Amino acid sequence: MDKTDLQVFIDEHHIQATILPLSEHTLTVGDAARALAVNTDQIIKSLVFHVDGKPLLVINNGLARADRRKLADHLGVGRKKVKFASPDTVFALTGFIVGSMPPFGHKQKLRTLVDTAVTQLDVIYGGGGDVDAMMRLTPDELLKVSQAEVVPFSE
């Protein structure tokens, strides 16, 4: 899948989001912030974990790290049950490669958690479906589309 597929998803679901084509690759938060001339906190990361064998999408912002202990506590499992999914697994579940993955529009709908810090911003930027695209939207729109739980899980 790519930014064209993401745009179709946005259009079909009447989502208030804009895909921004860029002239450079944005594989990291720093790359994306520089390309968009925004603060790193406005860049959201969509990370796939396996929790007790089930996929979970976790969205946090900037350079913040997801605290596996906090995730485990929220989910009622031991910390060792919360593991990062491999890039191949991420692609199989979402249809997008790591570094381009949007927070929604995946091949498979995933249970989603959004860190509370993401909801405190006016505008956020997530993966746009390709390494040379980002998507602009509001936290409210993200929560509406993803049906995410808001949880404080960043370190």
Question: Model-found features: residue ranges?
Answer:
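Extended, low-hydrophobicity, polar/charged segments
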Residues: M1-E155
